[in-house]
Swiss-Prot record:
Gene: mscL
Record protein name field: Large-conductance mechanosensitive channel
Keyword Cytoplasm applies: no
Provenance organism: Bacteroides fragilis (strain ATCC 25285 / DSM 2151 / CCUG 4856 / JCM 11019 / LMG 10263 / NCTC 9343 / Onslow / VPI 2553 / EN-2)
Lineage: Bacteria, Pseudomonadati, Bacteroidota, Bacteroidia, Bacteroidales
Keywords: Cell inner membrane, Cell membrane, Ion channel, Ion transport, Membrane, Transmembrane, Transmembrane helix, Transport
Functional note: Channel that opens in response to stretch forces in the membrane lipid bilayer. May participate in the regulation of osmotic pressure changes within the cell.
InterPro entries reported in the protein's UniProt record: Mechanosensitive_channel_CS (IPR019823), MS_channel (IPR001185), MSC/AndL (IPR037673), MscL_channel (IPR036019)
Length: 146
């Protein structure tokens, strides 16, 4: 019986609205991140690289130690580089994603504020009390006698 209780507890937890909403958000966020990365890498960075001299940002690096080659021309030791271009690319990705999320949250906040500011429908009249119902019945009976 302990296992079924554990499974029931897990099912109740997993099916809560917040957990499901969060899972959907993570999946959509992952897809959105790929789209933004493509926009940055394929649309924004090439013109920016062209403006600064035809440089591809992902190729930017500082060579701390050059590669070593043997007498036969084969590389014997790889170069040691600090690839700051990849960091710049990731930074631009982050800034655009953060800005997009900011705009989305701002839009949602504005929409919820407008919804909250909308005039509420007038409240329904309260149900008649027992006394009012009794008085109505008495009135109707008196009308029938006349």
């Amino acid at each position: 019986m302990g296992k079924s209780t554990f499974l029931q507890d897990f099912k109740a937890f997993a099916m809560k609205g917040n957990v499901v909403d969060m899972a959907v958000g993570v999946i959509i966020g992952g897809a959105f991140g790929k789209i933004v990365s493509s926009v940055v890498a394929d649309i924004i960075m090439p013109p920016l690289g062209l403006l600064i001299g035809g440089v591809n940002f992902t190729d930017l690096k500082w060579v701390m130690k050059a590669a070593e080659y043997g007498a036969d021309g084969k590389e014997t030791a790889a170069a040691v580089t600090l690839n700051y271009g990849n960091f710049l690319q990731a930074t631009f990705d982050f800034l655009i994603i953060a800005f997009s999320i900011f705009l989305f949250i701002k839009l949602i906040t504005k929409l919820t504020q407008k919804k909250a500011e909308a005039p509420a429908a007038p409240p329904a009249p309260p149900a008649p009390t027992k006394e009012e119902i009794l008085l109505t019945e008495i009135r109707d009976l008196l009308k029938e006698k006349q």
